[in-house]
UniProtKB/Swiss-Prot annotation:
GO cellular component: cytosolic large ribosomal subunit
Presence of keyword Kinase: no
Gene Ontology terms describing biological process: translation
Domain of life per record: Bacteria
Keyword annotations of the record: Ribonucleoprotein, Ribosomal protein, RNA-binding, rRNA-binding
Protein's name according to its UniProt entry: Large ribosomal subunit protein uL14
Species whose genome carries this gene: Sodalis glossinidius (strain morsitans)
Recorded family membership: Belongs to the universal ribosomal protein uL14 family.
Pfam families (UniProt xref): Ribosomal_L14 (PF00238)
Disulphide linkage map: none
An example molecular function term from Gene Ontology annotations: large ribosomal subunit rRNA binding
Amino acid sequence: MIQEQTMLTVADNSGARRVMCIKVLGGSHRRYAGVGDIIKITIKEAIPRGKVKKGDVLKAVVVRTKKGVRRPDGSVVRFDGNACVLLNNNSEQPIGTRIFGPVTRELRTEKFMKIISLAPEVL
């Protein structure tokens, strides 16, 4: 469950380290985002010479949450932290060329197949 002002780690090599959610996209008064949802973020901490810099406003897709995601069989997949992958504002394709850490099967839609193929592990 990601809401406005939530700090997330970045699970790709775009150059950002920590980001903050500034808007949950999809609905006029939508409060929370879960795994697979697109959010608007601003970069709070970045590495030197990265593809993005501090203060940039981009879109991102949530790939891991502490709250977890419930499966139809009743199991819940939870993670130690909240993480996202940065997306290009126009094409909504990943900015980075590598994904770090596992991602969930819920991302396996037409939109995010690139993230699934780059991820080292799909849970």
